[in-house]
Each structure stands twice: as C-alpha cells, then as structure tokens.
Amino acid sequence: LEWTQAILEAAEAKKAPVLIQTSMGAAKYMGGYKVAKDMITNLVDSMNITVPVAIHLDHGDYEAALECIEVGYTSIMFDGSHLPFEENLKLAKDVVEKAHAKGISVECEVGSIGGEEDGIIGTGELADIEECKQMVATGIDYLACGIGNIHGQYPENWKGLAFDHLQAIAEAVGSDVPLVLHGGSGIPQEQIEKAISMGISKVNVNTEFQLSFAKATREYIEAGKDLEGKGFDPRKLLAPGK
C-alpha cells in the first residue's frame, strides 16, 4: 500500500506515466492478483491520478500470466527463460494470443537474469541473439534480455553491462521492439542512460526501494519514535519508508 501510494504520488508530481508491477510472490503476500490490481486501480481513482498507470506482472509463470490476463492487468511478463527454449517459445505464443485478444501487452525473457527474485535464483547469462529474434517473432510487445544485469544488489566485482551485446540484440530484433533492463537498482546512472540510448525502454527497479524503505523504518525505530505516543501505529511506523 505505502509503496503504491508513494509511486503514484511521485508519478503525478512529475507528470510521468508509470508502470507498477507485482511479482508472483508480492501478489501472493497481498492476497492475490485481483487484490493487487483492485488496490492500484482504486488508489488511482481516490488519489485523482491523471497520468497513465500500467499494472504489470513481473516474472510470471504460465498460470500466473493467464490469471493476470483474466483479472485485468494491463501488461504481462511471461518468464519461461528457465524452460527449454522451444517450450518457452510455445507458451509465449499462447500467452501473446490470449493477452492480445484483450488488449494486454506482453513481455518475455531470453537469457535468465542473474541474482535472486522471490526465491528464484537466476544464473545470469547473455541472451542468445537467434533466440531473441525467434521470441520477438511470436508477437511480444517488449523483450527482456540478459546483458550482464542481475536482480538484487550488485557485487563489487561486477563488470558492468555488456553494451556490445545489447547493440547486437537491438540490431537483430529491430528498433520497433522495446527492450527491457531488469535489475535496474545498483546500475550506475550513466550506464542506465547509455542503455536507454541503445534501445532499453523499460528499466525495472525494486531492490533500491526495498533498501530505502528498510533504512528509513530502521532509523525510525532505532530513534525510539515507535515508543513516543502512538508511534507504534503502523501508519506512523511505515510513513518514513514511504
């Protein structure tokens, strides 16, 4: 709730369209995809948000993708990157067909993203160029591709984004296909800006929010604010993180 409010407030203040995404784990924690979707749409209404707001499923399996299509998400990521490529391709085609029938956009991934996301650990790899071309041919609306990026915090010995590989992917799939950069937290700003100039159109950020939220909440408690008056009220306890 607090994150959604903060994101919507920031988007409205900047007059910038925003995409709010839920992972499978986050949606389960919140009570399901319909609960998450309804909360966002109701907040958009009650907060008088005027900028476009997309509701996106992040790293969803086949079943999650179909459920989000049914409950009204406006954008779906089907992630079959852990499956044999032919199976990934087959399921992606089916998700695209079902989603496009309802005007919903689809993101798919080639080359697993490194790090951990909701308990799922990706080894991290550079996306295969030919597989990227085949995935785009399914009719997906945007493509997530491994270019050295990872989920979570980046290690000190991280070598940076593989820009040569990003350029090769962009040239292979064409300029009409937006590319997606997962693991945006921790990537230096200049690398993000360079990636955008080379075809990246969607940058996912999560860990950065989690760390900021945790830091502000911890400082509130360590300062003893939760012991002052009704400072223990979750609305006050979580406000600094928001």
Question: How should these model regions be labeled?
Answer:
Residues 188-242:
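C-terminal alpha-helical cap/extension of soluble enzyme domains
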Residues 1-26, 33-50, 59-176, 189-200, ...:
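Alpha/beta enzyme core
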Residues 181-185:
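Glycine-rich beta-strand-to-loop/alpha-helix junction loops that act as flexible
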